[in-house]
C-alpha cells in the first residue's frame, strides 16, 4: 500500500511537470531540437510514392527501412537518399522504393537479417531473400498445437546477427514467449526451423522489445510496466526490473550502446492518459539500474529514436489533437513538440542520423523527413563534435562552443603569464610584447613618460612624472616654494599675500591659514572688478558730496530762521520757490538712498546659499561689501586663527558664500561675525555723529551761535535715523545668524538676541508710533528736519507711515538669510539641506517682494509718480534676480549670473535716471539759469542751421 501511494505521488508530479513543460515549449519552438524550417512529409498521394503503400509494421537495418504493407506487398526504402528527394518532393525513384513480392497474409511483426526479411502473421511465419522476389517461403503453424495459441506482439520482431526473435505470448495465460529462428539453418523452411523460448513468468502480455546489438541484450517490456533483460547469445534471462510508478504497458524504447543507457516509454496514468513517462536505465551484462525519469505529453509511444552523438531523444506520441513528434535532451530538458506535417496515425519506426542531423519518421501511409538542431552551443562552431550536449573541441580550439582558437602556432603566447590567447591572437600583458608575447619590456612601456632600464626592466621617469609606470604626476611643490607673485599665481590653489610677500595656500577669499589684508588670487589685478568698484565709489561719492553740499546752505538758512524766531516769536514762512526747491531736494535725496538700497539688495542676494563668483562679493582685494552691503575693507585683524585642510587638486575660483562662509573668510571662528559687523556699524556712526556732537558741544558754549544749536540737534537726529535705516539689513543678518550659530555660545547668542529684538523689531515699531502725529506736526520745520527722511516722499494724510512696510520687507529678507545660513560644500548637484535652504530663502524673499509690490499698487503712497514707477521696476528686477539664484543649484550657471548682472545694471541706471529727473524738477533760480542757457544754445544752433540752408 505504501509503495502504491509513493508511486501515485511520483506519477502526479510527473504529470504536472509534463503539463508545465509543454505549456512553455509549444509557444517557443526555437527551444525544440527539431528544426521547424525544414519538415517535409511524403504521403501516398504524392508523385512517385507507392500507390499501394501501407506500412503497419516495419524494421530498420543498415540505413534501410523494410516493411510489409497492408496489401501484403514488401517494400524497401533507402533512407540515405531522402535528402536528395526532399529537394523536389519526388520519392518515386526505384533506388528509393523497391517492391519485391507479396506475402500471403498481412504481417504483424517483422525482422531483418543480412540476407533475409522475416515477417510473422497470424498463424504463419514468412521469409524472403533480399532482392529475390521469387524466394518467398512460408510455414503455417496454425495446426501446430505448440504454436497455435501464440499471440504475436505488434512490431515485436528483432534480429541479432543471424538470429531472429519474435515476441509473442500465450493467449490463455499471457506468458511471454520468444520465437527464435536461425537464419543460417539449412533445410526446408518449416515448423522445425524455429523453436520456442519461454520467458520468466513475471512477464505478462509482452508489449515491446528493444535490442542492444553490441552486447546482445534484449529489453522486453510487458503490459504491467515490468522489464526483462534477456541475453540473446545465451538465450537466458539476466534480470527483471519492476517499477511501481508505471502500472501500464511499456511501449517503444531506444538504447545508447556506447554508454549502455536504455530509454523506454511507459504509459503513465492509465491507457487513456496523455502522459508518457520515460525511464532512463543504466545496464550491464548482468544488471539494470534506474537512473532518472521524466514525462512527456502524449500516449501510445509506438516508436523512439536517439542521436547518440549529440544526446537527443525523439518520441512519436499521440494526443487528443493528433500525432506529434517530441524532442528532448537525454535528461528530459529542452523539450519541444512539432505537429506540422505529422500524420494523424501511430508511427511505425524512427530513424536518426547523427552525422547529417536528419530524422525520418515512418507512418502507415506517409514518411516525415526533417533536420534537427544540435543542442551544443553554436553546434561547436564547426570546430568540434557534440557529445551529449557538450562540445569536444578540436585540438586548436576551446570554449563551450569551440569558438576560441588556441594560439598553438604562436607558442601559446609563450606561457600563461606573458599574455592571453583570444581567437588565435595573443594579447600580451603589460610587461610583454611581440606576436607571441616573447619580448620583455617595461610595464606599460612607461606610458611614454620615461625610459626602460633593460637591466631590471624598471621605468626611469622624466622630471614631471613618477610611479612604477610613470603614470603619476609629480606633486607640485608647496605654495611657500614660490618667491614671486607671478609664479605663485600660476598655481590654482596658491595666492599671493602682498603685505607679507609670501605665497600661501588659499582661495579667493584669503589664505587657509592666517589672515592677509592684501590678498591676490588668480591674477594680480582684476581690471574689470576694480573699474566697477571705482564707478560705484565715484557715484556714491558724487551723490554724497551733492547731498552734503546742498545741505549747508539749507542749514544756514534755517539757522537764520531760528534767530528770527527768537526775535519775533514766529518762524519765517518759506516762499513758494523755496518750498518747491526743498520738496524736490527731498525727492532727489530719496532716490540717492534708493540707489544705495539697491546695492544692499545685491549684497543680500549674494548671501543666498548657492554658488556665486567670488568677485561678485569681493570688489577688490581691499574692499568687501559683505559687511554692511557697501564696499568697506574686508575686516579688522582677527583675534584667533582659523584653518581648513588643504587640497593640492582643488580649485576654488568659484565659491559658495552664505553668511557662514563669509564668517569663515574672516579667518576666525563663529564668535567673530557679529562683532565685526558691529565694529563697522559703530565706526560708521562715529564718523558722522562725532563731528556733529563736537559741533554741538562747541556751540553750547557760544552765546552768539545759540540758534545753531537747534540746527545741529536736528542734523544729529537726521543722521542717526539715516544710519539706523542703512545698517538695518546688515546688522539684522548678523544678529539672526548669531542666534543660530552652531557654537550655541551665550557670548554670541545673547547679544544677537538683544540686537534682534531692540533693533530688528523695535526700530519699525518705534517709527510707527513716532509718525502717529497730526498732519500739522508733519509739516513742522523742526520735526521735518529730524524725521522727514522717513515720510516726506509719501502722501502726508494717508501714507506717511508706509516706511514701516519697507522695514517689514527688509526684516523678512534679512532674517531668512541669517537664520538659514550654513556651511555647504561645493558639491553639485546640491542635495538635502544644501538644496532646501536656497529654495526656502528664494521663496520667502520673493513672497516679501511680491507682497510689497501689491501694497505699492494698492496704496500708491508716493507724491512723485517717477518714484512710484521706479519702485515698480526695482521690485520686478529684484524678484527676477533672487529667483535667478536657483539657476546655480545643479551647477554654476554663467547665464544666470550674466542675466542677474545685466538687469541689476539696468536697475542702477534707472535709479540714476530718476535722480537726474528729480534734480531737473527743482524750481530754483540756478536751474532756471541752466535751462535758459541750454535753450539759448539750441536756438543759436537752429538759427545757424537755417542760414546754412539758405546759402545752399
From Swiss-Prot:
<feature type="topological domain" description="Cytoplasmic">
    <location>
        <begin position="700"/>
        <end position="722"/>
    </location>
</feature>
<feature type="transmembrane region" description="Helical">
    <location>
        <begin position="898"/>
        <end position="918"/>
    </location>
</feature>
<feature type="topological domain" description="Cytoplasmic">
    <location>
        <begin position="774"/>
        <end position="801"/>
    </location>
</feature>
<feature type="topological domain" description="Extracellular">
    <location>
        <begin position="744"/>
        <end position="752"/>
    </location>
</feature>
<dbReference type="GO" id="GO:0005886">
    <property type="term" value="C:plasma membrane"/>
</dbReference>
<feature type="glycosylation site" description="N-linked (GlcNAc...) asparagine">
    <location>
        <position position="412"/>
    </location>
</feature>
<feature type="transmembrane region" description="Helical">
    <location>
        <begin position="592"/>
        <end position="612"/>
    </location>
</feature>
<dbReference type="GO" id="GO:0034394">
    <property type="term" value="P:protein localization to cell surface"/>
</dbReference>
<feature type="domain" description="EGF-like">
    <location>
        <begin position="438"/>
        <end position="471"/>
    </location>
</feature>
<dbReference type="InterPro" id="IPR000742">
    <property type="entry name" value="EGF-like_dom"/>
</dbReference>
<feature type="topological domain" description="Extracellular">
    <location>
        <begin position="613"/>
        <end position="678"/>
    </location>
</feature>
<keyword id="KW-1015">Disulfide bond</keyword>
<feature type="transmembrane region" description="Helical">
    <location>
        <begin position="869"/>
        <end position="889"/>
    </location>
</feature>
<feature type="disulfide bond">
    <location>
        <begin position="442"/>
        <end position="452"/>
    </location>
</feature>
<feature type="transmembrane region" description="Helical">
    <location>
        <begin position="528"/>
        <end position="548"/>
    </location>
</feature>
<keyword id="KW-0245">EGF-like domain</keyword>
<feature type="glycosylation site" description="N-linked (GlcNAc...) asparagine">
    <location>
        <position position="182"/>
    </location>
</feature>
<keyword id="KW-1133">Transmembrane helix</keyword>
<dbReference type="GO" id="GO:0000281">
    <property type="term" value="P:mitotic cytokinesis"/>
</dbReference>
<feature type="transmembrane region" description="Helical">
    <location>
        <begin position="802"/>
        <end position="822"/>
    </location>
</feature>
<keyword id="KW-0581">Phagocytosis</keyword>
<keyword id="KW-0732">Signal</keyword>
<feature type="glycosylation site" description="N-linked (GlcNAc...) asparagine">
    <location>
        <position position="243"/>
    </location>
</feature>
<keyword id="KW-0812">Transmembrane</keyword>
<dbReference type="Pfam" id="PF07974">
    <property type="entry name" value="EGF_2"/>
</dbReference>
<feature type="transmembrane region" description="Helical">
    <location>
        <begin position="753"/>
        <end position="773"/>
    </location>
</feature>
<dbReference type="InterPro" id="IPR050969">
    <property type="entry name" value="Dev_Signal_Modulators"/>
</dbReference>
<feature type="transmembrane region" description="Helical">
    <location>
        <begin position="723"/>
        <end position="743"/>
    </location>
</feature>
<dbReference type="GO" id="GO:0031589">
    <property type="term" value="P:cell-substrate adhesion"/>
</dbReference>
<feature type="topological domain" description="Cytoplasmic">
    <location>
        <begin position="859"/>
        <end position="868"/>
    </location>
</feature>
<feature type="transmembrane region" description="Helical">
    <location>
        <begin position="679"/>
        <end position="699"/>
    </location>
</feature>
<feature type="glycosylation site" description="N-linked (GlcNAc...) asparagine">
    <location>
        <position position="231"/>
    </location>
</feature>
<comment type="function">
    <text>Involved in substrate adhesion, myosin-independent cytokinesis, organization of actin cytoskeleton, and phagocytosis.</text>
</comment>
<keyword id="KW-0325">Glycoprotein</keyword>
<keyword id="KW-0130">Cell adhesion</keyword>
<feature type="topological domain" description="Cytoplasmic">
    <location>
        <begin position="549"/>
        <end position="591"/>
    </location>
</feature>
<feature type="glycosylation site" description="N-linked (GlcNAc...) asparagine">
    <location>
        <position position="456"/>
    </location>
</feature>
<keyword id="KW-1003">Cell membrane</keyword>
<feature type="disulfide bond">
    <location>
        <begin position="461"/>
        <end position="470"/>
    </location>
</feature>
<dbReference type="GO" id="GO:0050821">
    <property type="term" value="P:protein stabilization"/>
</dbReference>
<dbReference type="Pfam" id="PF23106">
    <property type="entry name" value="EGF_Teneurin"/>
</dbReference>
<dbReference type="InterPro" id="IPR013111">
    <property type="entry name" value="EGF_extracell"/>
</dbReference>
